[in-house]
């Protein structure tokens, strides 16, 4: 039922089409919900492996922000984790390079009240990790927020011309293999908005 609800959501479908266009022939472009057939074929063991993999400490990061003593907090965390035991990870990470070019244009036909626009630019992957990855991600997010976020002059101009409404947003993604900017909008002025962006 959740799969059908997702497939009936125009925004979710358009976002998945965007990922498929950005990362064709790559796991990043594959719908994580799967298909009706793959869902029916999923076993308890599959779900257990997915859960154990996702929530395994070797696959997690802890980011803490605030006014605290870092050493005292680290001592609390280490004491908490020392009481726990974890099996070695039961998975082998397979990383595929993103090699296929971005698909230039995808168009979906649906009966909706307002056209949906998904624009995206895929950037070269960055070989970053740890604090440098977080730092560069924040820099990108702030930059694009200043450039076209709701407080920017560009957004104000587009909003005044009724090219965008409150459904306009941009999202910057920087991770191990994923690096792109995506712009999402609902507009009856698609050509004007695309030209302005």
Where are these regions (language model features)?
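Charge-rich, well-structured scaffold segments of protease-associated domains
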Residues: 1-90, 123, 135, 144, ...
């Amino acid at each position: 039922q959740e799969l059908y609800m997702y497939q009936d959501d125009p925004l979710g479908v358009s976002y998945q089409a965007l990922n498929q266009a950005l990362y064709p022939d790559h796991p990043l472009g594959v719908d994580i919900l799967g298909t009706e057939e793959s869902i029916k074929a999923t076993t308890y063991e599959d779900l257990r492996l997915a859960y154990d993999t996702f929530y395994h400490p070797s696959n997690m990061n802890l980011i803490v922000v605030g006014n605290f003593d870092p050493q005292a907090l680290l001592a609390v965390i280490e004491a908490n984790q020392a009481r726990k035991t974890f099996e070695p990870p039961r998975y082998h990470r397979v990383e595929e390079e993103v090699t296929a070019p971005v698909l230039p244009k995808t168009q979906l036909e649906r009966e909706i009240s307002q056209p949906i626009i998904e624009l995206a630019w895929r950037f070269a992957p960055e070989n970053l990790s740890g604090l440098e990855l977080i730092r560069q991600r924040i820099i990108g997010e702030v930059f694009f927020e200043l450039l076209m976020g709701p407080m920017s002059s560009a957004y104000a101009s587009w909003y005044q011309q009724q090219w965008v409404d409150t459904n306009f947003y941009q999202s910057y993604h920087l991770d191990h293999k994923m690096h792109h900017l995506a712009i999402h909008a609902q507009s009856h002025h698609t050509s004007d908005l695309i030209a302005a962006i």
